[in-house]
């Protein structure tokens, strides 16, 4: 499971001209699911995302988490995080999980992150053509992969 975490002042996702979800200060998370991902990957990633300290404290040091600042989260499914570009110039997504695997894990991630933060998280719509708008803060962008826990 992979996520790209962007610290934002605000973000929203629009589908067919209608805003589906919007948040204020917090994280926009692009989430990709791989065929071999499990609930254990969800649990590890939720713990890391909720506890990640990339918001400034009173001294201007990145020392506060999303939970600490009572921030919001917007989670958007993103199978293209598993693009393979080894052969040729057209990416392949053979490592991205099938719909049957990825939808339940995406929903589990959103539910568990909501529980960890004590508030609902915004979501996109799985498989939809979405327009994502954000105002990066910093910018601070972090990539996490449950198969590479560095």
Q: Regions from the language model: what does each represent?
A:
Residues 93:
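Glycine-rich, phosphate-binding/catalytic loops in enzymes
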Residues 1-89, 97, 104-150:
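N-terminal, polar/charged subdomain of small-to-medium soluble alpha/beta proteins
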């Amino acid at each position: 499971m992979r996520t790209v975490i962007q610290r934002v002042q605000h973000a929203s996702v629009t589908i067919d001209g209608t805003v589906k979800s919007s948040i204020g200060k917090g994280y926009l998370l692009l989430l990709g699911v791989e065929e071999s991902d499990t609930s254990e990957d969800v649990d590890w990633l939720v713990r890391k995302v909720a506890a990640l300290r990339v918001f400034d404290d009173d001294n201007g040091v990145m020392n506060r988490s999303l939970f600490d600042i009572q921030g919001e989260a917007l989670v958007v499914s993103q199978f293209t995080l598993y693009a393979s570009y080894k052969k040729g110039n057209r990416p392949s997504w053979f490592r991205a999980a099938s719909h049957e695997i990825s939808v339940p894990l995406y929903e589990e991630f959103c539910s568990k992150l909501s529980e960890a933060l004590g508030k609902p998280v915004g979501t996109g719509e799985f498989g939809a053509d979405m327009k994502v708008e954000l105002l990066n803060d910093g910018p601070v962008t972090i990539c996490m992969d449950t198969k590479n826990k560095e």
